[in-house]
From Swiss-Prot:
GO cellular component terms attached to this protein's record: extracellular region
SMART domains found in the cross-reference section: Knot1 (SM00505)
Record GO terms (molecular function): sodium channel inhibitor activity
One Pfam family here: Toxin_3
Native species: Brassica napus
Protein name: Defensin-like protein 4
UniProt KW Secreted keyword: yes
Keyword Disulfide bond: yes
InterPro entries given in the database record: Scorpion_toxin-like, Scorpion_toxin-like_sf, Scorpion_toxinL/defensin
Gene3D superfamilies tied to this protein: Knottin, scorpion toxin-like (3.30.30.10)
Length: 60
């Protein structure tokens, strides 16, 4: 999966992942800005969250 998933980059995780919309800003920006098929949010401790762009497959 490491070849498929690439972090969006910058400190965008919380802003891209916190709003409860579908599809998330993470998915929207990965598609629009990076040419990815989808994106997903990985939550860590507290507000530590990463937006990962998926270049291999569409995910809900």
């Amino acid at each position: 999966d490491s070849e498929c998933l690439k972090e969006y980059g910058g400190d965008v995780g919380f802003g891209f992942c916190a709003p409860r919309i579908y599809p998330s800003f993470c998915v929207q920006r990965c598609r629009a800005d990076k040419g990815a098929l989808s994106g997903k949010c990985i939550w860590g401790q507290g507000s530590n969250v990463k937006c990962l762009c998926n270049f291999c497959r569409h995910e809900p």
